[in-house]
């Protein structure tokens, strides 16, 4: 079954590459929307979640304006704590939501179906930590520095891999969180 899925994926990528070769890299629509899976670390816990982002390329150039929203969720197991302290919680639930926007620089390869980009985004992040019915929340300034690459299947669709460093200041404590995201890009508008 895995071999069939992998074979189908390889055929799709090869067919998409051939169809992309018929359109130039500078002929892409100016708006792209990205949605996908995202993994981040937070408070020494791995968090899984989602990410949605949009970018508008000014005059279909290398410069764009990007906004993104993401949510990450997870639990930290404290299995030894209830043994040491009876009645203590056995896990801590974490959630992290980000709302950021800022400039994005994109390089479109003239020879390959690949776009590489970098961005520096600013905004706010919201964290919630809860255990045994008690919770605490904080909203703080955040910034995101990172980038990624799109593999263009055709003029409208692409697959994206993205790696970011998310910096937050929750509970008066500055922390940097690595974040990796994988998903699909859909492009809107008419190429300029």
Regions found by a protein language model. Give the residues of each.
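Membrane-spanning beta-strand positions in outer-membrane beta-barrel proteins
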Residues: 32, 62-64, 115, 152, ...
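Bacterial N-terminal signal peptides
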Residues: 7-17
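Gram-negative (and chloroplast) outer-membrane scaffold detector with strong preference
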Residues: 55-132, 140, 181-188
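Outer-membrane beta-barrel domain signature
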Residues: 22-24, 39-45, 88-94, 132-137, ...
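Short glycine/proline- and aromatic-enriched beta-strand/turn motifs that initiate or cap beta-hairpins
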Residues: 21-59, 122, 181, 185-192
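Residues that define the transmembrane beta-barrel architecture of outer-membrane proteins
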Residues: 29, 46-50, 93-99, 114, ...
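Predominantly the C-terminal beta-signal and adjacent terminal strand-loop region
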Residues: 77-78, 151-192
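Transmembrane beta-barrel strands of outer-membrane/channel proteins
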Residues: 33-39, 67-71, 118-124, 147-149, ...
């Amino acid at each position: 079954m895995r071999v069939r899925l992998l074979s189908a994926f390889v055929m799709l990528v090869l067919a998409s590459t051939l169809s992309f070769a018929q359109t130039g890299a500078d002929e892409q629509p100016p708006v792209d929307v990205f949605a996908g899976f995202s993994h981040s670390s937070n408070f020494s816990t791995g968090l899984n979640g989602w990410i949605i982002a949009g970018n508008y390329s000014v005059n279909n150039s290398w410069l764009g304006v990007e906004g993104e929203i993401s949510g990450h969720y997870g639990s930290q197991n404290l299995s030894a704590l209830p043994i040491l302290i009876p009645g203590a919680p056995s896990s801590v639930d974490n959630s992290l939501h980000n709302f950021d926007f800022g400039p994005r620089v994109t390089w479109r390869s003239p020879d390959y179906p690949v776009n590489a980009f970098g961005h520096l985004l600013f905004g706010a992040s919201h964290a919630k930590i809860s255990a045994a019915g008690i919770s605490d929340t904080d909203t703080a300034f955040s910034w995101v520095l990172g980038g990624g690459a799109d593999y263009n299947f055709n003029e409208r669709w692409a697959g994206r891999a993205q790696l970011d460093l998310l910096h937050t200041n929750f509970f008066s404590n500055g922390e940097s969180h690595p974040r990796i995201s994988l998903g699909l890009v859909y492009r809107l508008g008419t190429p300029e």
